[in-house]
Amino acid sequence: MKTKTSLILTVAALALSGSALAEVKIALVAKSLGNGFFEAANVGAQQAAKELGDVKVIYTGPTTTTAEAQIDVLNGLIAQGVDAIAISANDPDAVVPVLKKAMQRGIKVVSWDSGVAPAGRQIHLNPSNNALIGETNVKLAADALKALNVEKGDVAVLSATPTSTNQ
C-alpha cells in the first residue's frame, strides 16, 4: 500500500516538477471516507509527502459511495486550486466531465485503484488485475477451509460498488 501510494504521489509530483509553486497540493480522493483501505492509502500518502518535501496531501472523499457525491468533492478541489488529483473512482464514466474541467484548468489527474475512463485522466496506476485478485482470494479461502477440514459450504462474494472498475 505504501509503495503504491508513494508511486502515485511521485508521479503527480513529477508531472508538476516544472511548476514554480513552493508547495504542491495533491488531492487523494477516496471512493468513500471511513474505509480502511483508503485510510491506509492516506497514511502512505502523508509519509510519501514528507519524504518528497514541499508536497501537501489533501485526503478527501465522499461519505457515500456515489458518483454524484464524488463529483461534489472534485468540484470543491477544483475551486481550491489543487495542483493534482489522484482518484479512485466510484464510476469510471460519471466523473469524466468534472475531471476534464480540472485538466482544462491545468490540474494533473491520476486515477488509481478503480480507474477513470481515459478521457478523464492523464495516467492510471493499476495495482493488480481483477483475475489475479479473484484467483488469489479463492485460493486463500479454499486453503483456509481445507485447514479447518471444511469440505462443503456456501460462498458469498462482497463488493464495494457495482460501478467500480475493480469490482
Model-assigned labels for residue ranges:
Residues M1-I8:
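Bacterial N-terminal signal peptides that target proteins for export
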Residues T10-A12, L21-Q167:
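A residue-level marker of the well-folded mature domains of exported/periplasmic proteins
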